[in-house]
Amino acid sequence: KVDKSLDSLNKEIDHFVQHVKDTKKNMLNAGHEISWNYEKKFLPKSFIEKQIIRVNDNVALLNHRDVLRLFGYTKGHYQRAVWRIDKFHEMVWFPKLYSNSDWVNRYDQETNTILQFRKDLKPHPIPPKDEHDRIVFAHQKNIFGQTVYKFYGIFTADHVKTDSVRHYFKRINTTIDLTKYF
């Protein structure tokens, strides 16, 4: 391990700060809007106003109710793992993408699939072929330790890989146009 001198470290930091400033300047010159407000980041209204959400936008909200507001929900807190939007043959799914008391849900970045199975490996009903598409907002902790629900995209059951124990869901879209829900 090589320790850096304080002067060397300061130069490295200055270089990185200049890189960030240059990147921001280039983005502004290209017409991109750059604004960041920590509180606004978690408001459903911010995303509804944008009208479209994308996986690459790192969309995360603080609770089920706030996520469901994106889809026209107007009631109080909601705690279930799934909320159906029958009008559009969709559902919002809130999987925990880590092992928990009863279920294991894993997201594979290489294949853009979610694997779901019971911890006891008991069979559970295979999703029907006409099941609603799943708009996935996964339960996770952000870098500040807050529980958030992060948008992973729209998924559908992969009936080729799914069996009665292991269910696979493949991502079919990384973008949602929210205007259809209002």
Regions inferred by a protein language model and the residue ranges of each:
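Generic intrinsically disordered, low-complexity segments enriched for polar/acidic and small residues
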Residues: 13, 35, 104, 114, ...
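Catalytic cores and motor modules of nucleic-acid processing enzymes
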Residues: 1-60
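Low-complexity, compositionally biased segments
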Residues: 6, 10-13, 17, 25, ...
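Acidic/proline-rich low-complexity IDRs
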Residues: 5-8, 114, 120, 171, ...
